[in-house]
């Protein structure tokens, strides 16, 4: 699978992801970019799960952002509704972590839109490791959001066999 982590701290929000794509137990590619900017660079998003499914979801989410003039929560709820009710979309297997200057959200195929505690998101196979590392760093250091996300990904990459050390990182200024 993968690891995606999002951290919000001191006026910055970051989403970072590794680059490993696997097919079964074989590494197919090591430099996949699973994090990208959407909606005129005002939203950042990362995915965990099937690559083709995730790109479909990115496209659908960007359409929802355009329909709702960039309102992250409304776009996320509308995507989750469609994802839950549309037969074709229900077959897509991916999770999205999305953020703008105000909010960080997880969007799931079950129709869930979750705003996590402490604006910390970690999804994918290495998510629990990245979340534990990022939480410890948030609570015990003065490190910035980008440094925390990078270190959390490094730790997840050392532990999770489906996570590598090729990182893609996107960052936005944050009001939250």
Curated annotation (Swiss-Prot):
Main location, first listed in the record: cytoplasm
PROSITE patterns in the cross-refs: PROTEASOME_BETA_2
Gene3D superfamilies xref list: Glutamine Phosphoribosylpyrophosphate, subunit 1, domain 1
Keyword presence, Protease: yes
EC number: 3.4.25.2
MF-aspect GO terms: metal ion binding; threonine-type endopeptidase activity
Activity regulation, per record: Allosterically activated by HslU binding.
Keywords: Allosteric enzyme, Cytoplasm, Hydrolase, Metal-binding, Protease, Sodium, Threonine protease
GO cellular component: HslUV protease complex; proteasome core complex
Localization: Cytoplasm
SUPFAM superfamilies to which the protein is assigned, alphabetical: N-terminal nucleophile aminohydrolases (Ntn hydrolases)
List of catalytic residues: 2
Any one GO biological process: proteolysis involved in protein catabolic process
PANTHER family with a match to the protein in the record: ATP-DEPENDENT PROTEASE SUBUNIT HSLV, METALLOPROTEASE TLDD
Its biological purpose: Protease subunit of a proteasome-like degradation complex believed to be a general protein degrading machinery.
Record protein name field: ATP-dependent protease subunit HslV
Species of the source: Klebsiella pneumoniae subsp. pneumoniae (strain ATCC 700721 / MGH 78578)
